[in-house]
Curated annotation (Swiss-Prot):
UniProt protein name: Tumor necrosis factor receptor superfamily member 19
Originating gene: TNFRSF19
Subcellular location field: Membrane
Intervals, Cytoplasmic compartment: 192-423
Record note on quaternary structure: Associates with TRAF1, TRAF2, TRAF3 and TRAF5. Interacts with LINGO1.
Amino acid sequence: MALKVLLEQEKTFFTLLVLLGYLSCKVTCESGDCRQQEFRDRSGNCVPCNQCGPGMELSKECGFGYGEDAQCVTCRLHRFKEDWGFQKCKPCLDCAVVNRFQKANCSATSDAICGDCLPGFYRKTKLVGFQDMECVPCGDPPPPYEPHCASKVNLVKIASTASSPRDTALAAVICSALATVLLALLILCVIYCKRQFMEKKPSWSLRSQDIQYNGSELSCFDRPQLHEYAHRACCQCRRDSVQTCGPVRLLPSMCCEEACSPNPATLGCGVHSAASLQARNAGPAGEMVPTFFGSLTQSICGEFSDAWPLMQNPMGGDNISFCDSYPELTGEDIHSLNPELESSTSLDSNSSQDLVGGAVPVQSHSENFTAATDLSRYNNTLVESASTQDALTMRSQLDQESGAVIHPATQTSLQVRQRLGSL
């Protein structure tokens, strides 16, 4: 059984080989018998290809058994054919490419005819004596042996085409937009830089105004820092204290009057500083003084501030006008113009010196408090006697509330002050 199967497979394979050989032989015989310009017709015979006349060519390739249906057609554009034959049409010569004049145009039956070289070009001569078809530029300087390069060519300048109005308008719009954007950016940068500069810049003017107008609000312990300012600034302090300061701000204004006084070193503040309290406590009597008297100073200043509006002169504008009229006067000049002020000051100072050894700090506070009151009453020389009595009554009530004991020497000082008020 196996042998029979192998025999049948061999027969099938051999049959296929014979069939393939026959087909290949048939194809070879059909195409191989015809020559280059021959094609095989329907009967299987090789027939020569058709020849076309001038200006015509076959529509398809013909030869080696192919091109049975090829026909003659006219040459395509820019091509020509001068003779009969099997060849195809050739491309025409372009005289502009070779830099030469064109004498005749190209046609289907003839090629284009080129003339001499264009101005500024010449034809090179080969070694064998023939000239090239293409003309080359003369160059600078031109070769002397070429006649075509001897004369220069007059070139005509062609005017450039003017731009259209639409392009001009578009360019103007673009430039305007760019300029606007740049200007806006510049303005924003300036504003930003100015804000940054103002935020970082210290406000010296505001600080000076705060020192000038708010100086009366400082406590008496801070007044030594303000002695460096001039007499004119002190007058400004007195001028504005009545208008801008409330009842609480009127008590420290004595410090401003102290700066305006003829001799600031001798008068002092109505309430002593911490340094003066320590100096007095160093004496024999200071050893027995309780430590809470330091806080009593602030309470006296606070209680006296409530009563200070009652002691103000309703006609205090005269003193302000005096400062305004003579702002250039120094402390010594004002001292010389007011001899009564010297006597008042000397009386108060003598009375205070007599009480340094034997009086307690509470009595010294009342004494200095009386001296400051006398100074303010002298500056207001037109105070009526009724207002003086009211102020004295108010001061005595304040002293009683604070627990202070009025010393007999203090009463003497009060009598001196009453005499000055009656003047």
